[in-house]
């Protein structure tokens, strides 16, 4: 007996995307945005199918993502932001709350939400993950969003 395997494909044609982007550490965040847009366009989507919502920082991402998801205008949401560890416990709290909040929005709304929030020890790691040594996590998050929309459409 052959098990039927169902998975999403990397085809962004006819998918409406919302980018929800934290402005804090924007010089790195903008590289994530560029990576996400590049991925969508390389996989058959277009800039006309993308809307971008900017919020102050990572803590606000779940709130904006939920409002966007509930609008019903988008097939997928890509959250992008940058959290860099400082000398206080603020990093741990912020990273945990942003992560949990974004996951909760996805579960509550059943809209595919891709997590493209960098949580790094230092600025060098953030730069590496925004398009240099370690690829571009914005690009990776967009790939996840494309695949999830196409998977959802088969369920």
Swiss-Prot record:
Lineage: Bacteria, Pseudomonadati, Chlorobiota, Chlorobiia, Chlorobiales
Gene encoding the protein: ribH
UniProt cross-references to InterPro entries, sorted A to Z: LS, LS/RS, LS/RS_sf
GO molecular function, one term: 6,7-dimethyl-8-ribityllumazine synthase activity
Gene3D superfamilies referenced in this protein's UniProt entry, alphabetically: Lumazine/riboflavin synthase (3.40.50.960)
Protein name: 6,7-dimethyl-8-ribityllumazine synthase
List of residues binding (2S)-2-hydroxy-3-oxobutyl phosphate: 87-88, 129
A Pfam family recorded for this sequence: DMRL_synthase
EC top class named in words: transferase
GO biological process, one term: riboflavin biosynthetic process
UniProt source species: Pelodictyon phaeoclathratiforme (strain DSM 5477 / BU-1)
Pathway it works in: Cofactor biosynthesis; riboflavin biosynthesis; riboflavin from 2-hydroxy-3-oxobutyl phosphate and 5-amino-6-(D-ribitylamino)uracil: step 1/2
The family this protein is said to belong to: Belongs to the DMRL synthase family.
Protein function: Catalyzes the formation of 6,7-dimethyl-8-ribityllumazine by condensation of 5-amino-6-(D-ribitylamino)uracil with 3,4-dihydroxy-2-butanone 4-phosphate. This is the penultimate step in the biosynthesis of riboflavin.
């Amino acid at each position: 007996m052959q098990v039927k395997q169902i998975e999403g494909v990397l085809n962004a044609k006819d998918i409406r995307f919302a980018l929800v982007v934290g402005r804090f550490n924007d010089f790195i965040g903008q590289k994530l945005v560029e990576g996400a847009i590049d991925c969508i366009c390389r996989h058959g989507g277009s800039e006309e199918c993308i809307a971008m919502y900017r919020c102050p920082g990572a803590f606000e991402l779940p709130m904006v993502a939920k409002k966007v998801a509930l609008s019903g205008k988008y097939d997928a949401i890509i959250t992008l932001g940058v959290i860099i560890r400082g000398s206080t416990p603020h990093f741990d709290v912020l990273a945990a709350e942003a992560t949990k909040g974004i996951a909760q929005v996805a579960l509550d709304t059943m809209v595919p939400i891709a997590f493209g929030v960098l949580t790094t020890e230092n600025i060098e790691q953030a730069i590496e993950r925004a398009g240099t040594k370690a690829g571009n996590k914005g690009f990776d998050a967009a790939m996840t969003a494309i695949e999830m929309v196409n998977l959802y459409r088969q369920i």
